[in-house]
């Protein structure tokens, strides 16, 4: 039987697709401050109705059928409808449109992509309820402490099924041909290795400017320089979400890899720090991060850095020597090195003779160095797999949707789902499974056996400098960073303009966050009350 290897003590907390003002909290609490707990449906109760699933994944017909049929063996009068597609980067806007409708048609979605929506079920209300499909508390079916994805009112809005770890894949053959004998442990060494690769005629890095450089690594390296912001943003005694048993024993230790798992994040304290200038971006630290980024990018990236999203295919074809990516590619790259089916070639849009096998491995994030650095680099260790949120509707429909979610996120439902996934050619799990009691194939266990846990830099505030409150702000802030990387402004000018942007857009941030000025002024006040 499978039990999550990422333990509760070493749980992963992540911002996911939301900004710092959209998802708040920490893992470890047994219940959130949201609506009162409701009774689960009795095991013998027969349900009827329709559940519409519209998560961000695009499962195959076989996977959908396996889960639907397994559920309908227990609940034959329930119709399971799937509104899933390969929406990719369009999913957040698509979901926003669905949630804005007067009569919302979908029931189960990936709510972290619209984290400020106030109509999700507080899943913490069901954490201690007996799951009729496992005959144990739902808490025991799933690692609830992987992340704590909360809305501004403290309601848990999403549960994920897998963990993920981000690092750097590299082509050992190209490293050997260039005479590189040691992996880069520092940012200076990263630049040196890239210089040698470039001199050998190889483009060093395939990286995109959508979710990799301006998101993952913006978070990782902001965290290195700003770990002390924890002392400002963590809940203090008297705050509405302060947990004396948990927060009362917190001791700030920048060398603790899992520090972001050890405190409760209070978004009001973060927003207050931004508004009052206690937390600032026009600093030598921000300028130094950008200076270091400039030493690598766009200089050692592909020419299409700012527009590409397909860096994996470049790495597969040995057009680049290094690829930043997630644990999902441990299986995918292994499979692609072994065999590329006609269907896989068509998916990648490449010819069969475009790929030759090579030796590859991974290395962790090279450390930036200097007097302004406050900690060692962490990774992005967040959630992946399926993201499950439930739309709150009338009581009968809500109970039906939650019942299906409890089935899916337990061995009863996830086993046939996983079996159907592994039956598909080329399936590659994204990371360690977090559903208990599921029999996973030996090859899946082997994929993640050596996966390191470095701590998660995707804490709630680390991505704010390059994302703001999301939407157009993210586009604006990515463009501003590109101006600095392209030498149109200096790193110091960038830091100054960054601070001005955040100040000028405060009102928009407040609106998008779902907070009021009264909330920001008073961390003892629970948002939404």
Identify what each model region corresponds to:
Residues 54-55, 59, 83-84, 151, ...:
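C-terminal capping/gating helix-and-loop segments adjacent to ligand/active sites or protein-protein/ligand interfaces
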Residues 45, 331-340, 354, 369-479, ...:
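C-terminal lobe and pocket-closing loops
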Residues 1-19:
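N-terminal secretory signal peptides and thylakoid transit peptides that target proteins
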Residues 70-145, 173-185, 314, 321-322, ...:
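Extracytoplasmic "Venus flytrap"/periplasmic binding protein-like
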Residues 66-68, 115-116, 202, 284-400, ...:
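Extracytoplasmic/periplasmic substrate-binding proteins
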Residues 194, 232-305, 349:
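Glycine-centered hinge/linker elements that transmit conformational signals in sensory
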Residues 65, 88-125, 137-158, 168-169, ...:
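Pocket-flanking alpha-helical
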Residues 112-166, 238-260, 349-364:
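Hinge/lid segment of periplasmic solute-binding proteins
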């Amino acid at each position: 039987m499978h039990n999550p290897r990422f333990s509760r003590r070493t749980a992963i907390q992540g911002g996911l697709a939301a900004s710092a003002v959209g998802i708040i909290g920490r893992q470890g609490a047994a219940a959130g401050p949201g609506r009162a707990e409701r009774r689960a449906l009795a095991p013998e109760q027969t349900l009827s109705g329709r559940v519409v699933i519209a998560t961000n994944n695009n499962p195959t017909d076989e996977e959908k059928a396996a889960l639907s049929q397994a559920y309908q063996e227990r609940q034959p009068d329930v119709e399971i409808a799937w509104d899933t597609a390969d929406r990719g980067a369009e999913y957040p806007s698509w979901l926003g449109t669905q949630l804005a409708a007067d009569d919302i048609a979908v029931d189960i979605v990936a709510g972290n992509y619209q984290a400020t929506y106030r109509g999700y079920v507080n899943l913490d209300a069901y954490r201690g309820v007996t799951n009729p499909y496992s005959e144990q508390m739902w808490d025991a079916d799933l690692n609830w402490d992987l992340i704590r994805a909360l809305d501004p009112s403290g309601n848990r809005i999403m549960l994920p099924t897998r963990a993920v770890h981000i690092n750097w894949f590299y082509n050992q053959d190209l490293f050997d041909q260039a005479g590189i004998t040691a992996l880069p442990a520092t940012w200076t060494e990263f630049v040196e290795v890239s210089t040698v690769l470039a001199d050998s005629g190889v483009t060093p890095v395939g990286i995109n400017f959508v979710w990799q450089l301006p998101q993952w690594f913006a978070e990782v390296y902001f965290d290195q320089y700003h770990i002390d912001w924890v002392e400002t943003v963590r809940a203090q005694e008297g705050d509405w979400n302060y947990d004396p048993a948990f927060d009362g024993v917190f001791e700030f230790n920048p060398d603790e890899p899992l520090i972001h798992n050890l405190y409760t994040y209070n978004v009001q304290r973060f927003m207050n720090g931004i508004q009052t200038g206690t937390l600032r971006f026009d600093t030598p630290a921000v300028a130094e991060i950008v200076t270091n980024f400039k030493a690598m990018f766009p200089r050692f990236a592909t020419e299409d850095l700012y527009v590409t999203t397909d860096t994996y295919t470049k790495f597969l074809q040995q057009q680049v020597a290094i690829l930043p990516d997630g644990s999902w590619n441990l299986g995918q790259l292994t499979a692609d090195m072994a065999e590329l089916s006609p269907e896989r070639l068509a998916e990648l849009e490449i010819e069969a003779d475009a790929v030759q096998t090579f030796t590859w491995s991974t290395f962790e994030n090279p450390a930036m160095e200097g007097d302004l650095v406050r900690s060692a680099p962490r990774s992005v260790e967040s959630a992946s797999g399926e993201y499950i949120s439930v739309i709150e509707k009338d009581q009968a429909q809500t109970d039906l949707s939650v019942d299906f979610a409890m089935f899916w996120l337990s061995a009863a439902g996830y086993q046939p789902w996983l079996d159907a996934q592994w039956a598909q050619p080329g399936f590659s799990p994204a990371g360690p499974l977090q559903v208990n009691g599921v029999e996973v194939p030996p090859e899946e266990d082997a994929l993640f056996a050596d996966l390191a846990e470095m701590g998660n830099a995707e804490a709630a505030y680390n991505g704010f400098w390059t994302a703001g409150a999301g939407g157009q702000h993210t586009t604006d802030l990515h463009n501003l960073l590109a101006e600095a990387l392209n030498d149109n402004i200096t790193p110091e000018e960038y830091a100054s303009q960054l601070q001005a942007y955040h100040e000028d857009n405060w009102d928009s941030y407040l609106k998008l966050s779902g907070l009021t000025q009264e909330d920001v002024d008073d961390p003892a006040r629970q948002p939404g009350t």
